[in-house]
A protein has these predicted regions:
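ATP-binding glycine-rich phosphate-binding loop
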Residues: 11-37
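A glycine-centered beta->alpha junction motif in the catalytic cores
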Residues: 92-105, 153-161, 245, 287-305
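Active-site activation/catalytic loop segments of kinase-like enzymes and analogous catalytic loops
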Residues: 239-272, 285-304
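ATP/Mg2+ or Mg2+-diphosphate-binding catalytic cores
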Residues: 291-335
Length: 335
């Protein structure tokens, strides 16, 4: 037994008294622990967030639950009504344990369920504003600056590649211009009035953006799809989540337009997309996100052992380019 696990066993009584539970066993699981209790299985894990962030996430989850979206990992509260417990100076959160499988984006049925659950979550999140005194993380309106910065980094990395001339650099220089073209198209669309209108609409309506809608945070249990891992949630246009889902699915199916339609139809059936959202989604999907990420990680790590790995990853991105461009050519016909 590791020192970490033995410390958790030593904290059993503290957890029981804080949550008014009786724990029969504590088992390590992933980054936390499964607790068998007299109130069902629970999942305890350390949270790297600040106390204010936990309070905000708890507030957001309560709003979702109170507005009909109950398939999520709500925080259990202590007898003092706190959504966390402090153990040896560290903050821990307790949630119901959801025993299911992580979403397989390569599986159409899983991806469609993920789109449906996302729409239901966004619908329930409307009108959300945090309680007084709780700071709301806000990324609203920062997309243009963020992508512009990444565009500048792509240009800067081109100059770096011209100086270095290694295997990775040659591949980068061979393809960078066409990815720059995609980035410029993306920023051109974002510079239109649609994005500004979406920002104003989101500010007016309120809402919850998950901000980390990835496979490990989408749990399938029988016919029910649970959304977990809300620690990055905040105020942002809702299509940020939908674009993340689409991008992950598209990379699993060579940017197949009919499969994108499956997800868009599943989402829109509950939450129709506006013309402004369709335009801004196009801008976001155009941006060569993975190309930037792979190159950025390579030029900022420069560990010799990683060069082969990053070169392979870059080659994968280059191989994907034609399918990506073809998909973007079909994008407007999806709506």
């Amino acid at each position: 037994m590791s020192g970490r696990d033995s410390k958790m066993l030593e904290s059993k009584e503290l957890i029981e008294s804080a949550y008014d539970l009786r724990i029969s066993s504590i088992k390590p699981c992933r980054a936390g622990y499964i607790l068998d209790t007299d109130n069902g299985k629970k999942y305890l894990r350390q949270c790297q967030c600040s106390e204010n962030r936990i309070l905000f996430v708890h507030d957001a989850k309560q709003h979702l639950h109170n507005h009909g979206f109950v398939n999520l990992d709500t925080y259990c509260v202590t007898i003092d009504e706190h959504p966390f417990i402090e153990i040896e100076g560290q903050l821990f959160i307790l949630t119901p344990f959801i025993d299911g499988h992580e979403c397989e984006f390569g599986d159409d049925a899983d991806a469609v369920k993920a789109a449906q659950a996302l729409a239901a979550m966004h619908k329930a999140g409307k009108g959300f504003k945090p309680q007084n005194g709780i700071f709301m993380p806000n990324d609203l309106g920062k997309l243009t600056d963020s992508l512009s910065k990444r565009y500048d980094e792509i240009l800067r990395m081109r100059r770096k590649a011209e100086r270095e001339r290694g295997a990775f650099d040659y591949i980068y220089l061979n393809c960078v211009d066409k990815f720059i073209g995609l980035a410029e198209q993306s920023l051109g669309l974002l510079g239109g009035p649609e994005y500004q209108r979406l920002i104003k609409k989101t500010l007016l309506e309120g809402g919850i953006c998950h901000h980390d809608y990835s496979y490990q945070n989408i749990i399938m249990k029988g016919p029910i799809t649970y959304i977990t891992g809300f620690e990055s949630c905040g105020e942002e246009i809702r299509i940020y989540d939908l674009v993340n889902l689409l991008r992950r699915k598209m990379r699993k199916c060579n940017w197949n337009a009919p499969k994108a339609s499956l997800l868009l139809d599943a989402y829109s059936e509950l939450e129709p997309l506006s013309r402004d959202e369709i335009v801004v989604m196009k801008a976001m999907l155009l941006f060569p996100q993975k190309f930037w990420r792979v190159a950025n990680r390579y030029y900022n790590s420069r560990r010799s052992w990683a060069q082969k790995n990053f070169t392979g990853m870059l080659e994968e991105v280059v191989t994907e380019f034609t399918d990506h461009v073809h998909f973007m050519g079909q994008y407007d016909n999806l709506f």
